[in-house]
A protein has these predicted regions:
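Surface-exposed, interaction-prone regions used to assemble/regulate multi-protein complexes
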Residues: 1-135
Length: 135
């Protein structure tokens, strides 16, 4: 059975620029049960945007969406990121971007929350990993 992050609390997140990874550290807390620790790791990150951090965020899902759908929904925002900082370079031409992203194995992911932090990432992979309890 695949790990779920639905209703997990976001404890922290880390953006590692040089490695191009983002790690979301989450916990699933239920009274009278052991806390489940799960990390969501985006690898090969090309671009991302998170917003609405409530410092008590509850994740709903992190979903992979088709590139065309992703660019239809977030293309204007990605174009603005490119205008401001020149990255990601493929955003200079959003018409040819879907083909480039597919060729490079890059996908769009949408992070949705029941409360707080939401946003998106453009990355090669997402992994949902169990973690031993922190010491």
């Amino acid at each position: 059975m695949a790990l779920s992050i639905h209703d997990n609390q976001l404890i922290s997140y880390e953006v590692h620029c040089e490695e191009r990874t983002i790690t979301l550290r989450t916990e699933y807390r239920v009274e009278n049960k052991p806390t489940e620790f799960t990390n969501v790791v985006f690898e090969g990150v090309q671009a991302y945007h998170f917003e609405n951090d409530a410092f008590g965020n509850i994740i709903f899902d992190a979903a992979n969406v088709p590139v065309e759908q992703f660019l239809t929904e977030y293309g204007a925002e990605i174009s603005e990121l490119y205008r401001m900082n020149g990255s990601p370079t493929w955003a200079a031409d959003l018409v040819s971007a879907p083909e480039y992203l597919r060729e490079q194995g890059i996908k769009g992911f949408i992070l949705s929350s029941s409360l707080g932090l939401s946003g998106w990432a453009v990355a090669k992979e997402i992994s949902i990993l169990p973690v031993n309890a922190p010491r």
